[in-house]
Amino acid sequence: PAEADVILLNTCAVTANAVTDARQAVRRLQREAPGVPVVIAGCAAEVARKQLAALPGVLRVVEQDHKSRLLDAPPLVLFAEEAAGNVTPFPSSPAEAAARAATRDRTFPPFHIDGFRRARPVLKVQDGCSHGCAYCIVPLTRGPARSRPPKDCLAEMRRLLEAGYREIMISGINLRQYAMRDEGCRDFWDLLSYLDGELAPEWGSGARPDPARFRISSVEPAQLTERGIATLAETRMVCPHLHLSLQSGSADVLKAMRRGHYTPEALLSAVEGVAKLWPRFGLGADILMGFPGETEAHVLETLEVVRSLPLTYAHVFPYSARPGTVAAELPDQVEKAVRQERAARVRAVVEAKREAFWKDTLTCERLLVALDCNEDAGAASGQHGVDECYVPCRLRTPLRGEGHTLIPVRPVSLSRKGVIVEPVRP
């Protein structure tokens, strides 16, 4: 950091702790690189702009709507003193921040990626969210839902494939709200079908010696409709892996969260349909325990859903109140120790499912692993990556010159961190 002209700090604000972490990061950078100006972007820049701007060494706090200008050249033009006069005043209240978010630009910002340091680049096709879950600050920090034009998505996908990448993550803040109807895509499933139809003949399995694949970052349970599952069945390049924004297995809690657009029963039925499509598939979920008003009966409902789902992993969080959200003002807040205990109970069930799936992976004759050849990993630790079902894998013996490609391997043993594999040679 000390050799930099300017340090750009991209921040998160999904929890109150994330904003605290951003402030601590600025202070740490000032110790490590005294005198180097810091420019702050990201979600914390939207909800905690005033506090961050007051920190010593901070040259500029860039709003989300202006973030794309960071790509301009020369970048230091953005940080000139006279530009400060164009910054929107700080919102004086959460209500004002919400009103501002509702009027923000709905155009997807122009940018593209030609290269990526890791093995699995991210293709961002959607940003923002217009739903408004009770616990979530994202609509304020990221603004309303915005979708990337399909042809733009395809062009970037081609650039990444031609650069040698063989697994690409299709990502968005809320893929359920993807829509470009004027360009032939009613929803995310239309986009996925379009990308697969255009690329599979050249890049799909069987089309070339080094095929490529897509991975979907996360889907809303309500997206798993009959048409959605049918689209997955028709694609040739999508990994057999889904990550669900589940949040709770209780219908009552989902309604309190303002997530009543799906029910646990409908989700279980949809996942049964996915299981018929993919005999072996990875299934992850985000689960939030201890939401205000959650009772022991609700916890038992969630545990029953978790036991019923063929989960292979899950991110289980104890709820934490986020200032500026509806949930932070709700009555019947659950004590911190109880929240943590409930999350631990769910994690224990998920952990058993994860271990069982890893053991089952040992019965597979062949896996295709996207290796992460990041220089920071170091050859001494062995290269690591994920298989098509998102099982973490590590090569028993490191390979050289295999970055970004899909490596055929066979599983040989288990470790605490995943499956140990070795290459399958032709």
Regions found by a protein language model. Give the residues of each.
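Residue-level signal for inorganic ion chemistry
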Residues: 8, 43, 70, 170, ...
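Short glycine-enriched, charge-decorated loop/helix-capping segments at active-site entrances
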Residues: 13, 142-143, 182-185, 255-262, ...
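Conserved SAM/AdoMet-binding glycine-rich loop
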Residues: 38-39, 47-48, 162-299, 307
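Terminal RNA-binding accessory module
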Residues: 62, 329-426
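Intrinsically disordered, low-complexity coil segments
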Residues: 77-105, 114, 184-185, 197-212, ...
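Active-site proximal loops enriched in glycine and acidic residues that flank catalytic Cys/His/Asp
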Residues: 172, 218-220, 246-248, 285-289, ...
